[in-house]
């Protein structure tokens, strides 16, 4: 009986250890899933992998005589009742020239709705040379019923584009945005205002 009792205790301890290990693994996988999205986004923005454009803080200082056509595409994921489209379907720009175009979003629903856009470039290799100075990607946007919103994009094509042998026959680049529905953004607390209230002014 004693041996049997000891075996049962060992079995229970073993089961408990396995349960804790499985739970820890599950929690780690959930954390990795949430972390993978921003990490993948950063990786793509740095490398241009998968047609992801580059994000820069300054304009190009070199403008070439060669031109390229840039087309603009707009998509809406299921569950977001918006009309979303580029205000210009395409432009022809000089390589290195900074250009601004605009998209427009309209809430078709009778309630306030919320969306966030992701983006891509085709052909994929061109993403490494498509530089955005200003864009609305990965920003939470709120639209009231019937509200319209203009969404500017400022970009240029890196002059190094012409030196890439894999892109020598590319005459057109397509910039594509897709809006996805998101939950209502949480309000941001104004720390200064809170501090002023506590101090009586």
From Swiss-Prot:
Taxonomic superkingdom: Bacteria
Give the residue spans that cross the bilayer.
14-36
Task: Tell me any Pfam family this protein matches.
Answer: CtaG_Cox11
Q: What family classification does the UniProt entry report for this protein?
A: Belongs to the COX11/CtaG family.
Q: Which gene encodes it?
A: ctaG
Sorted alphabetically, the Gene Ontology cellular component annotations on this record are: plasma membrane
Q: How does it sit in the membrane?
A: Single-pass type II membrane protein
What is the protein name stated in its UniProt record?
Cytochrome c oxidase assembly protein CtaG
**Where is this protein localized, as stated in its record?**
Cell inner membrane
Keywords tagged on the record: Cell inner membrane, Cell membrane, Copper, Membrane, Signal-anchor, Transmembrane, Transmembrane helix
The UniProt function text for this chain reads:
Exerts its effect at some terminal stage of cytochrome c oxidase synthesis, probably by being involved in the insertion of the copper B into subunit I.
Q: Which NCBIfam families match?
A: PRK05089.1
Q: What is the lineage of its organism?
A: Bacteria, Pseudomonadati, Pseudomonadota, Alphaproteobacteria, Hyphomicrobiales
Q: Which organism is it from?
A: Brucella canis (strain ATCC 23365 / NCTC 10854 / RM-666)
InterPro entries from the xrefs?
A: CtaG/Cox11_dom_sf (IPR023471), Cyt_c_oxidase_assmbl_CtaG (IPR007533)
């Amino acid at each position: 009986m004693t041996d049997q009792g000891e075996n049962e205790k060992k079995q229970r301890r073993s089961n408990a250890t396995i349960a804790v290990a499985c739970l820890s693994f599950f929690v780690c996988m959930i954390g990795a899933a949430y972390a993978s999205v921003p990490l993948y986004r950063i990786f793509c923005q740095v490398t241009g992998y998968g047609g992801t454009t580059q994000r820069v803080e300054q304009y190009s200082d070199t403008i070439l005589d060669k031109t390229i056509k840039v087309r603009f595409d707009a998509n809406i994921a299921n569950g977001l009742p918006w009309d979303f489209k580029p205000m210009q379907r395409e432009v022809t720009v000089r390589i290195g020239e900074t250009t601004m175009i605009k998209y427009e979003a309209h809430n078709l629903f009778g309630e306030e709705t919320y969306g966030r856009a992701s983006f891509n470039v085709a052909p994929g290799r061109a993403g490494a040379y498509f530089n955005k100075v200003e864009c609305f990607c990965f920003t939470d946007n709120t639209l009231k019923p019937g509200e319209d919103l203009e969404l500017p994009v400022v970009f240029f094509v890196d002059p190094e584009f012409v030196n890439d042998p894999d892109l020598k026959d590319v005459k057109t680049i397509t910039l594509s945005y897709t809006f996805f529905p998101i939950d209502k953004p949480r309000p941001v607390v104004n720390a200064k205002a809170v501090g002023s209230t506590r101090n009586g002014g």
